[in-house]
A protein has these predicted regions:
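C-terminal accessory subdomains/tails of enzymes that are appended
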Residues: 3-14, 21-24, 28-30, 42-43, ...
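Short beta-strand segments that buttress and anchor functional surface loops
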Residues: 21-22, 66-70
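Aromatic/hydrophobic pocket-lining residues that form π-stacking "cages" and hydrophobic walls in ligand
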Residues: 36
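Glycine-rich beta-alpha-beta "Rossmann" dinucleotide-binding loop(s) and their flanking helix/strand
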Residues: 40, 95-113
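A conserved short coil-to-beta-strand element within the FAD-binding core of flavoproteins
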Residues: 49-64
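Short, hydrophobic/aromatic-rich segments at coil-to-beta transitions
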Residues: 62-66, 124-126
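Core beta-strand elements of the Rossmann-like FAD/NAD(P) dinucleotide-binding domain
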Residues: 72-83, 87
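Well-ordered beta-strand positions in beta-sheet-rich domains
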Residues: 76-80, 114, 266
Length: 406
């Protein structure tokens, strides 16, 4: 008990018997996805962003590609392939439906919600994993100036493109945290932002959302569309390995070509060439010293390193080259440049939500710099007034989704 309180003084002493201490994963799912894609580019992969598959192309009753539509320009074109893998998460069944192969097992979507408050409102020293009155488990995780906590696990059957946190979700999470930390007393007004995601689980008869297995499964249709669903983010490399091995075997049988074994566990993601945590700290120290001269803090250094890894050097080089009096805007300008030129960002929502996480973890900066960032994108892509207004409305919509509950 004493050791637990030393590591986390916020734990309720009167009911505390003890605690376990273990290593756990923490990541930013959008940043992880981007870095995986960028690393794949180094191995001759081709990337297409904002493109929707509308129908499959068949030859001799085999899927050999897809007709797709550019969501920005409206252009339509075909992509050919020896094999097609459907790894679309919550949308896996939609593509199976297009392929007329949505039979047997199907997805069961559940929603997970997270709330974000100022760190001083929930000042945990480190991540805490705890149970709540209904028997579920929750976590609270410090990140920079904020702490986020969650998550819920409820059935979901609405629009997959607009997954919102509602008042019931927010009230449940706040009540659970206040129950665990009675002296905190968080209210709805303390919530700075929120986000919600979907778990693409495999349906099992008679099981509740929390009871459904998180195991991934592979489905191969009669036309050889290969689909994968279920699983957890922490196992994404193992899931990818299973799919790639399956495709390689099929390819070898059909086209008589063998592939060398690829040891993906030895591949370091772009920007992440750190040997250990002490090396991360040393690099962060160096970045802090570099930006302290222009009034940035330790939290700013940690934000850059946690988001971009050693790619921070690229951003700071651009920062040094930019002629701009306001240092905060100058740094944002360098980040926007990096997002556009290195990460295929096409609009302010991409930047604030999917490339930097500012919408969730630093919502104040979104309000502060939204017009400046909009102007940067307008200049970069030569937008007309209507296009600029549309992207302004889109960002406003996502800000409302993250900061209000109905």
């Amino acid at each position: 008990k004493e050791e637990a309180l030393e590591k986390e003084p916020l734990l309720p002493e009167t009911i505390l018997n003890g605690a376990g201490y273990y290593a756990e994963y923490r990541t930013d799912d959008a940043r992880l996805t981007i870095e995986v894609l960028k690393t794949a580019l180094d191995y001759d992969a081709k990337m297409i962003n904002y493109t929707e598959a509308t129908e499959f192309i068949y030859e001799e009753n085999r899927v050999i590609g897809a007709n797709v539509k550019d969501s920005i320009s409206g252009d339509e074109f075909a992509i050919k392939a020896k094999y097609v893998v459907n790894a679309c998460g919550p949308w896996v069944d939609e593509l199976r439906q297009i392929n007329n192969s949505k039979i047997g097992k199907r997805l069961h979507l559940t929603k997970g919600v997270h709330l974000v408050v100022a760190h001083e409102k929930l000042p945990v020293k480190q991540s805490v994993y705890f149970d709540v009155p209904d028997g579920r488990m929750m976590f609270a995780i410090p990140r920079g100036k904020v702490t986020y906590f969650g998550t819920t696990d409820t059935n979901y059957q609405k629009d997959k493109n607009t997954v919102e946190t509602n008042l019931v979700d927010a009230t449940y999470l706040i009540s659970a945290v206040n129950n665990m930390f009675p002296d905190i007393n968080i209210s709805l007004d303390d919530v700075q932002s929120s986000w919600a995601g979907l778990r693409p689980l495999i349906y099992e008869e008679g099981k509740s959302a929390s009871e459904l297995s998180r195991k991934d499964e592979i489905f191969v249709s009669e036309t050889e569309l290969i689909s994968i669903a279920g699983g957890k983010l922490t196992g994404y490399r193992k899931m990818a390995e299973r799919i790639v091995d399956l495709v390689a075997k099929k390819y070898n049988r059909r086209f008589d070509k063998e592939f060398e074994d690829i040891k993906t566990k030895e591949i370091v993601l772009s920007g992440g060439a750190f040997k250990n945590s002490s090396e991360v700290k040393s690099y962060t120290d160096a970045i802090q010293n570099r930006i302290a001269e222009v009034d940035f803090t330790r939290i700013d250094a940690e934000y850059l390193v946690h988001n971009y890894g050693k790619q921070t050097d690229i951003i700071l080089q651009k920062f040094d080259d930019i002629m701009h009096d306001n240092m905060q805007e100058k740094m944002i300008k360098a980040e926007v440049w990096f997002a556009i030129n290195y990460e295929m960002a096409t609009n302010p929502t991409d930047f604030f939500m999917r490339r930097t996480g500012r919408l969730f973890f630093n919502s104040e900066s979104v309000h502060q710099f939204k017009n400046f960032v909009l102007s940067e994108f307008k200049t970069a892509f030569s937008w007309d007034i209507k296009t600029t207004e549309n992207h302004q409305k889109e960002l406003k919509h996502y800000i409302k989704m993250a900061t209000t509950f109905e």
